[in-house]
A protein has these predicted regions:
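Glycine-rich hexapeptide-repeat left-handed beta-helix
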Residues: 1-20, 53, 59-74, 78-86, ...
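N-terminal segments that cap or nucleate solenoid repeat domains
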Residues: 4-44
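Thr-Gly-centered strand-to-loop micro-motif
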Residues: 27, 52-53
Length: 184
């Protein structure tokens, strides 16, 4: 697949067009709208919706956003003058059918399938969030731990092998997106 084909997935909002580059893979069924900045070697998989319409979305390098995930933001208001942008760091794996809304994620994070992270939540680097977890608004998850549940609870410190896996997971998806870009 030619990299130029993904431009059909990019839509402007109020004259602001998503910023992508030739190292990105964006599946033809994904939709990216408005003020969204995507760093190098990011992959956006089938049926992802990313709406940077009422605030900004930033996705760091080597990050993968898997099938069916929704990325959105919180509008600026008198109660919340800056709103809540969505900031996703580098080497992040966002599993299938997650919802990330106006939150901040550091680097080397795995967000398990079906997890929901709400407005104002801060996820520090080197965190593993289990499948189906709910991170409530304004909650901070500190670095180096496994979190699961609804609402999310800190379970235990990550093992060295699990911390290494966080980075490896993102690199696996960089390799996969490179295969897709080559048409393999």
């Amino acid at each position: 697949m030619s990299n130029n084909q993904f431009t059909n997935n990019l839509r402007s909002y109020k004259g602001i067009f998503p910023k992508v580059n030739n190292s990105n893979y964006i599946d033809p069924s994904a939709v990216i709208v408005g003020d969204v900045t995507i760093a190098d070697d990011v992959s956006i998989w089938p049926l992802v919706a990313a709406r940077g319409d009422v605030n900004t979305i930033s996705i760091g390098s080597n990050t993968n956003i898997q099938d069916g995930t929704v990325l959105h933001v919180t509008r600026k208001s008198t109660n919340n003058p800056d709103g809540n942008p969505l900031i996703i760091g580098a080497d992040v794996t966002v599993g299938h059918k997650c919802m990330l809304h106006g939150c901040t994620l550091g680097d080397r994070i795995l967000v398990g399938m079906g997890a929901i992270i709400m407005d104002g939540a801060i996820i520090e680097s080197d965190v593993f969030i289990g499948a189906g977890a709910l991170v409530p608004p304004n909650k901070t998850l500190i670095s180096g731990y496994l979190y699961v549940g609804n609402p999310v609870k800190q379970i235990r410190r990550l093992k060295e092998s699990e911390v290494a896996f966080l980075k490896q997971s993102s690199l696996n998806y960089v390799e996969l997106k490179n295969d897709y870009l080559k048409g393999e």
